[in-house]
């Protein structure tokens, strides 16, 4: 049996899972798929292929599904792999990086369909209050080259060299099982998705472990396949709710309130701008719910 296991979490992933699974199985790693109550034939396709499958009757969220996968397979090294990612190389460089002194895990290089590295996504710095404030207030979109955003998204980083990093993307991320156990797994409070992998990396570093980026390990990544399935309002609520949960866990209470205030202000700015562009009150209503969520957090302190 391989000492590497692969966990793939699916949610309405029938169109992508075939190519992902073919590459995962070809790697020789033990593979388990955890499906979060897909309705598009994903489960039927997985059963047809005879893959090891946990088919949830309800959506457990990404973190919950990953934790289920870890409980199912016992390999000492576990790769988290998105269903829209296709492994293009050996996984051995990732395993070797996991064996470096004090290493908790390693992420590989993600490339788009044209083979271009996904700079700004595959490795990031851990979010700071300043980074999230600028994000909430639209300043990163209006001035993407600002120093805070350049550091957060690692826009000046050399993707051709191995390096210690703060936050490899969870789409192609190998973790030592012992570290997952020590940290108690991913935080299932980040439901159904977003920021759970960021929080996990933050907790890894708080424990004094290191994380690495390994360019020799490569996967082609489409990205965002499940996001369009969410209605605009729920997409915004989930993303901002997870952002606020991360901020409450990792920032000083004063800085958490600053982030909350920025989200309130930014929600009104975004709502007005998008409603004007689309000539619809729907974005304003959606961002109004986000502002309400952040406002409650501002006054409750969590």
Predicted regions and their residues:
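A conserved acidic beta->alpha catalytic loop
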Residues: 15, 23, 35-44, 58
């Amino acid at each position: 049996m391989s000492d590497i296991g692969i966990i793939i979490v699916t949610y309405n992933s029938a169109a992508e899972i075939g190519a992902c699974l073919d590459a995962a199985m070809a790697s020789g790693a033990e593979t388990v798929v955890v499906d979060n109550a897909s309705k598009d034939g994903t489960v039927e396709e997985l059963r047809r292929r005879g893959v090891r499958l946990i088919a949830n009757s309800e959506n457990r969220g990404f973190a919950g599904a990953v934790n289920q996968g870890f409980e199912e397979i016992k390999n000492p090294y576990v790769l988290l792999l998105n269903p829209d990612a296709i492994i293009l190389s050996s996984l051995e460089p990732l395993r070797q990086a996991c064996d470096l002194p004090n290493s908790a895990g390693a992420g590989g290089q993600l490339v788009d369909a044209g083979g271009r590295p996904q700079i700004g996504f595959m490795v990031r710095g851990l979010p700071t209050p300043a980074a999230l404030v600028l994000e909430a207030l639209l300043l990163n979109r209006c001035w993407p080259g600002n120093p805070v955003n350049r550091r957060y998204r690692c826009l000046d980083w050399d993707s051709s060299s191995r390096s210690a990093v703060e936050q490899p993307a969870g789409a192609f991320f190998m973790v030592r099982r012992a570290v997952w156990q020590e940290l108690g797994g991913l935080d299932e409070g980040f439901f159904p998705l977003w920021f759970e992998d960021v929080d996990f990396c933050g907790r890894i570093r708080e424990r004094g472990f290191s994380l690495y980026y390994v360019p020799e390990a490569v996967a082609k990544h489409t990205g965002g396949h499940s996001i369009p399935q969410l209605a605009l309002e729920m997409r915004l609520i989930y993303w901002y709710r997870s952002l606020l949960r991360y901020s409450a866990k990792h920032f000083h209470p004063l800085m958490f309130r600053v982030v909350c205030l920025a989200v309130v202000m930014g929600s009104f700015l975004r709502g007005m701008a998008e409603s004007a562009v689309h000539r619809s009150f729907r974005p304003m209503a959606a961002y109004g719910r986000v502002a309400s969520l952040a406002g409650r957090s501002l006054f409750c302190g969590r």
